[in-house]
Amino acid sequence: MQHKWFLPSTLAVLAFILYAQSLFFGYTYLDDDRLVANNFWFIGSSSGITQAFTRDVFLSTTAIYYRPLVTVSLAIDAFFARSPDNLLPFHFSNIMLHGAVVVLLYFFLQKLGYSKRVSFLSSLLFLVHPAFVQAVAWIPGRNDSLLALFLLLSILSFLHFLEKKSWVWLGAGVVTFALALFTKESAAMFPLLILPLVVAWNKKKPAFLYQWVLMMGLLTVYLVWFVARSNVVISSTSFSIVGFIAAFIHNYSAFFVYLGKLIIPIHQSVFPIVNGYSPNLGVFVFAVFVGILFFLRKKRTVFLRATFGLTWFSLFLFPVILFHNEGFALGQDVQLEHRLYVPSIGMLIFLLEVFVYFRNKKWQKLYFTAIGLIIVIFAAKTLVYSRSFISREVFWDQAVKTSPLSAFAHRNRAAMYQLAGNPDQAEFAYQQSLKLHAEEPMVHGNLGLIAYERGDLEQAEQLYLKEIEINPAFSLAYLNLGRLQIDQKRLEEARKNLWTAYLLEPQDTASLRLFIETYKESDPEKFAQLQAKFFK
């Protein structure tokens, strides 16, 4: 038993050592502030777990992402953190998830028939790969490591089931698939890999009864997930065929950028955008892989397994490029690197099959020496690159440096200047953002706040109104406009805007309190009634 667990334990320890510095990282202000700081009132309470399945992951009124198990994981961390200022439990969980995935990957590769040494080195390569830094060092990156954890548990369960024809393992496979689906919607692709897996590894098909139960189990999971998700995700966020096509036209090059970055991790960015990187490296790699696949076609088993690996990679990556986030201008969709985490498992299988086919025992020592050298280089790069996530200032400086064409990156760097009390630097950075995208959300509203703090109320009001025109769902624009109108004694207008702000973000009571406050002098009786109604 000790020998069996020595190598996987080594992987887990190395994962912790490699990413230990991230335990003390702060907020990046890319989603982590929304998921943890802004929502701590929810995830830090008992509701964080009991109501996770009835909310979207951001607790947003424009719900898009139904990922309840991500919320549950954050709620567990919040229990230990006790405060949104303590991020250590959140980062610790991210490291533990990565270590667990690497250990499961080791067992998965062995289950597919690869030797212990090959499985260990392959898992170690996955562990240190710089493309996965964002999945570990950035708190929201756990989307993908948690997804990988449940997918690997599911596929291992199915492999055990195919060997032992056990109802227990069949049930475990279905349950862990359900956990994956309730973690991230891209898990819906996973059942498409079950039959290719059976064929590629010459597994004996189970009896019809098992197949029928498996199909019914998967369909039940889909149905339960679909109903639960439909009750949370608003219908206006559904995607049309036209939307898919438009997104693909603007984002297709991301497939090649991702591929190139996975094979040779250069030109990395904490905030890469579609039109900011050349796909040439990925196109070249793709052409080479197609040629290799064509060459392998004569050896059926290797060909099928290599094809399975590429199918896995493509199935989990294509959804990334088929959706356009309406928060970004076309061509400025962000293609974050953590999304490579799950697809890369398939690519690893493809590369292992190529390695097995072309391996020459005479050169075996050279092969493993080269792999060891790559692992050392990748580990060093990961150690350095991880520090890009150390703080919000470092993060957005790196984002602008590596994605200078991103209006969003310039906007958020400006916001960091503004939070740090540097309005002049913030204003300049906001103007840079507007040069790239004249209607970048939040920019006019934040410029309005700078004008307000300078005492230029007329310009501030114009900027707030412009923000509302561009971004009518931005509650802070209404809140800040309401504050300005209170200063000008325009109470009726202020009440209208403050109430709108409250309706847009009901969990943020600042606008509601200010709305009620406007009645304190003019209508004390109504003030008392509203106080009693909303703040008993």
Show the residue positions of the predicted features.
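Terminal, low-structured helical/coil segments at or just beyond the last alpha-helical repeat
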Residues: L512-K536
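Polytopic membrane enzymes that build or remodel cell-surface glycoconjugates and lipids
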Residues: M1-E453, L476, N480
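Canonical positions in the second alpha-helix
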Residues: A399, Q432-S433, K466-E467, T500-A501, ...
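Register position in tetratricopeptide repeats
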Residues: L419, E453, D487-Q488, E521-S522
